[in-house]
């Protein structure tokens, strides 16, 4: 990016999936900037800041701004080739091909295929002239729900025992719902102006308090630079976007006795 007079946040997110396409889409919707993935241009009409950042200009692709991948997506929609984008950005063609596949996705494809490529219910709804709730209900009715995998910190050398999970649209779960009394805590998501580590401190203290009361604890967060995403802090960590869809998927799976939303700042509320 470029230095300027406007204060900007330095927060980050981390997303995990079975494929790059699934992961990058989850990462973008974790950012909490009003987008649900690699979005088309019209998704920014209501936000002048994002709209200005998305003005289509191939020469600007040389600069590694926070919106460059969205601009690359727009370039593919406008018919540019992988070779053309590579000459400007020098991004490895493999990644460019993956972004191109997202950009040119056929939304008439089966929902299962769209979900495997990381498309959210909101994205599918907007691109099929439907409603998010209708897409969600149809998906659940047809048993198209995510499975949850454990992060293998040992590269399959021996069995990993870390309670560190992510969702994907696969057939099998690596885990079962936690047994006993359990409470879910929604983390603060990415750090940004007005949303910092003070909220993460509150989430961690909530974990300690719940343990004293005899509850198992479940954390949902997508910020890799926080204490709340340390895998050994809680009984189970879901490294997922803190969005309605992703949180409700976890609630449907775990069926916790309660959910604490007041400790994570603006995001959970």
Task: Indicate where each model-derived feature is located.
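ATP-dependent carboxylate/acyl-activation modules
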Residues: 1-269
